[in-house]
Amino acid sequence: TQNTTPQSYFVDALTEQILTDLEDPDVGLGYSETQAYNTLYKGGLSIYSTQDLEIQGICDQVLNDDSNYPYKVQYGLSYALTVTRADGTQENYSSGHIKQFRNMKYGLTFDSEEQAHQVIESFKASIAKEGDTYDEVINLSPQPQASVTVIDQATGQIKAMVGGRGTKSSSMSLNRAYTGSTRQPGSCFKILSTYAPALDSAGETLATIIKDEPYEYADGTPVSNWWGNYYRGNMTMRKAIEQSANICAVKTLTEITPQLGFTYCQNFGLST
């Protein structure tokens, strides 16, 4: 009988890596996608991984322990709907349509799974016509989400991986811990692109004074801070990092040049 239990996130990543290696002529055999798939699943391979089951078990337990998160668990919705009308025409809808329907500015997050399903039914009712049939995919994930990868710093081997919080419903699903899932890095990017090169190559120190004041990009677009339309005056680079001051970061990047910042990001190994 066919095993319908979803693979773990670690096995998902391992599977993807093996297929990639089999198709890479410099690493594996230069197989086609079909050849690689057949070799993996039908070729009788013995596969040995770097996973440490004890570490993996700890990661699974900790990441899925609700007591490690805010008391009020919310649920994020990912949604896809295909409506087949009575005349055979099809219309496709996604999470974005539900956001518009509910006038939700930031994201589809609900206080309970039941609330999410109620909104879905209300949306479907708003577009329904006689004779419709529906094909939908509903994914609800507890929020906030999290992921973890444990690497042996001595060998570089991956010992454990969890790609998301909550019950895994399918194999090869979104893996937040794997390189295929990119995310906007936020203000931590200021350190890599701006302050690191300023400290390393431009003679700056953490005590360097940067003035938080009205400032514009070269095209005249004003730069704003996350805390609102006011300014905090002189602050050290250390304080600017602590406060995540946007204007200070832009002024520093302009001073060292974006080209230098870009070079440092490349040297740090960033490629996405």
Describe the predicted segments one by one.
Residues 1-65, 74-91, 271:
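Non-catalytic, structured segments within soluble enzyme domains
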Residues 2-4, 203-261:
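Conserved catalytic neighborhood of penicillin-recognizing serine enzymes
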Residues 4-13, 49-57, 168-169, 183-189, ...:
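Soluble non-cytosolic domains of exported or imported proteins
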Residues 34-36, 111-149:
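Intrinsically disordered, low-complexity acidic Ser/Thr-rich regulatory segments
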Residues 59, 155-156, 183-210, 240:
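Active-site SXXK
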Residues 79-91, 140-170:
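A short, well-structured edge-of-sheet supersecondary motif
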Residues 141-147, 169-192, 207-210:
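Short active-site loop at a secondary-structure junction
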Residues 262, 266-272:
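Primarily short, surface-exposed interaction patches in extracytoplasmic proteins
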